[in-house]
């Protein structure tokens, strides 16, 4: 670990439990924030007088919640692993990548022996997948202890110790799915993620798929789309994982039920989302928290701008996450110690600081569990200001848009080619200028394109739906278009040629590989991963998270 990183780690003090009222959530389990403060009895007795226990200064986390957090598999930066060769045609290593190599423990002109500075999105995506596999093979009640032993909590034991499922039926489904399976241990699951070219879910395999299917060279940052595409492909290549994957490669929160049911169970459902321009639009905060409170949740790979985290829970408006930016030596395939894959450290991030690009995962055990999941989304529809996951009977059976529909789609099917606008979002956008969406927003964040995007959105009549075309196609824009004058705040009508069309750039080549254009923030690939300097120039830059 570099001196800078060590100082940052020490400076970033671990958050304490200062809210003893608001419940704590961890992947569908809810915990009383005050349970740790009542270890034996709520009261103490002094000279025959019952005195309430003073808990006002206690800042510890409830032990049941902490045990659940420690049991999550945590993938992070590693150093000293077998070489990941430079991508074909890459003759040089830029200064930014060279600095990351040195930070990661050394320089090798042939490629990378550490992912420090560029692998955080891969690590958080690995964490999401690893915990889905943990649920698949060991169940939701499994708990990790240091050493070779572990604790398994049945549903009843979980409730008695303070953790409750938001849906007991889903927990029973998960326990049934693993009741007869003991061959796959936690050690086995972690071995699938070790940093070796032979491990099925290693960083080497993620990078290989990113190069082949997503045009992401070794040493470059992944976005949610490349991460989701990699998980989908690698699980298909390794059926021994016992987990199938449904991933809508076009991005967004659209889930097509007929395709999902054909995939089979147990199933990991992945949704790549973008919920705003610079930050998550507040109208989606309730939906995000609801996603993490579902018993099917396996977390979110996302983060703050330029930095990816693995989000597993929340308390109020604070999200809990595991941070992959803690470099550790690579674990050898012969090492059975799994301690470095677990953490008792809890990080918090307010929803307003969260980057809008993310990969959301759900573990579905069976068709019955799928029906339960759908019911949970339906029940919460009236409680949340805007849904972020939309379930359709099929890709070709999406109802036409009217006043009651959730969204209107404009443009093509790739991540960067369309925006969805909810009725509430349209109102908020008119007041705040934030055109965040439930599916995707343009990745190019310069002011010119943001203005053009807003113009297109505002030009669509409320009762008109422009359907997505699965291939790239021009989209007619109603004329005249209302545009804001550059010189003053008044609205002026600009007559455009009647034949003018908005051209949607073809992304077919990337769609065929299940990997759409990445969405995120403009960063310099030659800079360090933690740098947060935006640039208005697009030369030799990429839009990534």
UniProtKB/Swiss-Prot annotation:
Subcellular location: Cytoplasm; Nucleus; Preautophagosomal structure
GO molecular function: cysteine-type endopeptidase activity; protein-phosphatidylethanolamide deconjugating activity
Location of the region described as Disordered in the Swiss-Prot/TrEMBL record: 156-181, 459-545
Enzyme nomenclature, EC number: 3.4.22.-
BP GO annotations: aggrephagy; autophagosome assembly; mitophagy; piecemeal microautophagy of the nucleus; protein processing; protein transport
GO cellular component terms given for this protein: cytoplasm; nucleus; phagophore assembly site
Enzyme class: hydrolase
Pfam families per the UniProt record, alphabetical: Peptidase_C54
Keywords: Autophagy, Cytoplasm, Hydrolase, Nucleus, Protease, Protein transport, Thiol protease, Transport
Residues forming the catalytic site: 120, 323, 325
InterPro entries for the chain: Papain-like_cys_pep_sf, Peptidase_C54, Peptidase_C54_cat
Domain of life: Eukaryota
Catalytic activity annotation: [protein]-C-terminal L-amino acid-glycyl-phosphatidylethanolamide + H2O = [protein]-C-terminal L-amino acid-glycine + a 1,2-diacyl-sn-glycero-3-phosphoethanolamine
Purpose: Cysteine protease that plays a key role in cytoplasm to vacuole transport (Cvt) and autophagy by mediating both proteolytic activation and delipidation of ATG8. Required for selective autophagic degradation of the nucleus (nucleophagy) as well as for mitophagy which contributes to regulate mitochondrial quantity and quality by eliminating the mitochondria to a basal level to fulfill cellular energy requirements and preventing excess ROS production. The protease activity is required for proteolytic activation of ATG8: cleaves the C-terminal amino acid of ATG8 to reveal a C-terminal glycine.
Family assignment from sequence similarity: Belongs to the peptidase C54 family.
UniProt-recorded name of the protein: Probable cysteine protease ATG4
Natural source organism: Yarrowia lipolytica (strain CLIB 122 / E 150)
Species classification: Eukaryota, Fungi, Dikarya, Ascomycota, Saccharomycotina
Gene: ATG4
């Amino acid at each position: 670990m570099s001196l800078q990183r060590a100082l940052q780690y020490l400076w970033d003090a671990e958050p304490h439990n200062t809210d003893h009222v608001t419940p704590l959530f961890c992947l569908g389990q809810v915990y009383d924030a005050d349970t740790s403060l009542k270890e034996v009895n709520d009261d103490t007795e002094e000279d025959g007088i019952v005195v309430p226990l003073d808990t006002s200064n206690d800042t510890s986390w409830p032990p049941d919640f902490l045990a659940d957090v420690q049991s999550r598999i945590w993938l992070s930066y590693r150093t000293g692993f077998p070489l990941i060769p430079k991508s074909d045609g890459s003759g040089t290593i830029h200064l930014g990548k060279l600095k990351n190599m040195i930070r990661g423990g050394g320089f090798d002109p042939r490629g990378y022996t550490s992912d420090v500075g560029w692998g955080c999105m891969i690590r958080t995506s690995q964490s999401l997948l690893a915990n889905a596999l943990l649920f698949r093979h060991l169940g939701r009640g499994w708990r990790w202890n240091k050493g070779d032993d572990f604790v398994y909590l049945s549903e009843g034991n979980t409730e008695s110790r303070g953790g409750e499922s938001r849906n007991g039926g889903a927990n029973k489904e998960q326990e049934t799915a693993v009741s007869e399976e003991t061959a796959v241990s936690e050690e086995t699951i972690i071995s699938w993620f070790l940093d070796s070219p032979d491990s099925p879910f290693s960083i080497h395999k993620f990078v290989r798929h990113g190069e082949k299917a997503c045009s992401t060279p070794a040493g470059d940052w992944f976005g949610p789309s490349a991460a989701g595409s990699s998980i989908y492909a690698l699980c298909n290549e390794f059926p021994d994982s016992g987990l199938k994957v449904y991933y809508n490669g076009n991005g967004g929160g659209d889930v097509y039920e007929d395709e999902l049911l054909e995939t089979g169970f147990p199933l990991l459902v992945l949704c790549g989302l973008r919920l705003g321009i610079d930050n998550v639009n507040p109208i989606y905060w309730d939906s995000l928290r609801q996603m993490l409170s579902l018993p099917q949740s396996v977390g979110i790979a996302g983060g703050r701008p330029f930095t990816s985290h693995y989000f597993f829970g929340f308390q109020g408006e604070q999200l809990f996450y595991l941070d992959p930016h803690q470099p550790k030596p690579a674990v050898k395939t012969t090492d059975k110690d799994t301690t470095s894959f677990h953490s008792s450290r809890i990080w918090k991030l307010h929803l307003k600081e969260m980057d809008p690009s993310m990969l959301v995962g759900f573990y579905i055990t069976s068709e019955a569990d799928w029906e339960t999941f759908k019911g949970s989304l339906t029940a919460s529809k009236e409680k949340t200001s805007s849904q972020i996951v939309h379930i359709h009977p099929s890709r070709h059976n999406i109802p036409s848009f009217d006043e009651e529909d959730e969204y209107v789609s404009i443009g093509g099917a790739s991540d960067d080619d369309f925006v969805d606008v909810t009725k509430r979002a349209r109102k908020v956008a008119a007041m705040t200028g934030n055109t965040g969406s439930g599916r995707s927003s343009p990745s190019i964040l310069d002011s010119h394109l943001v203005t053009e995007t807003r113009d297109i959105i505002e030009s669509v009549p409320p009762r008109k739906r422009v359907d997505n075309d699965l291939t790239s196609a021009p989209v007619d824009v109603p004329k005249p278009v209302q545009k804001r004058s550059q010189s003053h705040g008044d609205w002026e009508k600009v007559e455009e040629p009647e034949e003018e069309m908005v051209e949607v750039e073809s992304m077919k080549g990337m769609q065929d590989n299940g990997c759409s254009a990445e969405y995120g923030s403009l960063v310099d690939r030659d800079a360090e991963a933690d740098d947060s300097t935006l640039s208005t120039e697009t030369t030799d830059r990429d839009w990534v998270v």
